[in-house]
Amino acid sequence: MSATRRLQKELGDLKNCGVKAYENVECEETNLLKWTVLLIPDKEPYNKGAFKVGITFPVDYPFKPPKVAFETKIYHPNVDEEGKFCLPIVTAENWKPATKTEQVMMALLSLINEPEPSHPIRADVAEEFQKDHKKFMKTAEEHTRKHAEKRPE
């Protein structure tokens, strides 16, 4: 299956899957290799908003993983200020061509709902998460209210 056909199928599958964890799955009108997805976490403190995620597929997809990054700011120990994060499923050494974008989105949602402070990208936020969890929750909720996208009705 060519990359174009595979991406068209995955785009259709994601748009029609009925999962409430992500919505507004879109691709650029002239570029099937660039998508945006609205990620909708269901756990505090991130359940006060939604987060736009950009996905860029390489031309040799599915043999190489997509690049995925948050376009919406998020206060999270596993996401840096530029929206980058480490998710094993999309690293070159762990990527499998059979992996689908929906699996990537579910793994990312799991990371957002269940932070991993033992593997932080932002050590200061991870330390706050572990040592002053109440302050972390308050700061993350305020940050979410200020920066996140509106949750779909």
From Swiss-Prot:
EC category: transferase
InterPro entries linked to this entry: Ub_conjugating_enzyme, UBQ-conjugat_E2_core, UBQ-conjugating_enzyme/RWD
GO cellular component: nucleus
Function: Ubiquitin-conjugating enzyme E2. Accepts ubiquitin from the E1 complex and catalyzes its covalent attachment to other proteins. Required for diet restriction-mediated lifespan extension, probably acting as part of a complex with ubiquitin-protein ligase wwp-1. Acts redundantly with lin-35/Rb in the regulation of pharyngeal morphogenesis during embryonic development by negatively regulating the expression of proteins such as sup-35.
Record key words, sorted: Transferase, Ubl conjugation pathway
Disulfide bonds: none
Catalytic activity: S-ubiquitinyl-[E1 ubiquitin-activating enzyme]-L-cysteine + [E2 ubiquitin-conjugating enzyme]-L-cysteine = [E1 ubiquitin-activating enzyme]-L-cysteine + S-ubiquitinyl-[E2 ubiquitin-conjugating enzyme]-L-cysteine
Family designation: Belongs to the ubiquitin-conjugating enzyme family.
Molecular-function annotations in GO: ubiquitin conjugating enzyme activity; ubiquitin protein ligase binding
GO BP: any one term: animal organ morphogenesis
Tissue: Expressed in neurons localized in the head and tail of adults.
Enzyme active site: 86 (glycyl thioester intermediate)
Domain annotation UBC core: ranges: 2-149
Complex formation: Interacts with E3 ubiquitin-protein ligase wwp-1. Interacts with RBR-type E3 ubiquitin transferase ari-1.1.
Entry's EC annotation: 2.3.2.23
SUPFAM superfamilies with a match to the protein in the record: UBC-like
Observed effect of gene inactivation: RNAi-mediated knockdown very slightly reduces viability and brood size; phenotype is exacerbated on a mutant background which enhances the overall efficacy of RNAi. Increases sensitivity to paraquat and reduces lifespan at 25 degrees Celsius, but not at 20 degrees Celsius. Abolishes lifespan extension completely on an eat-2 mutant background. Substantially increases embryonic expression of sup-35.
Pfam families per UniProt: UQ_con
Coiled-coil annotated residue ranges, if any: none
Protein name as annotated: Ubiquitin-conjugating enzyme E2 ubc-18
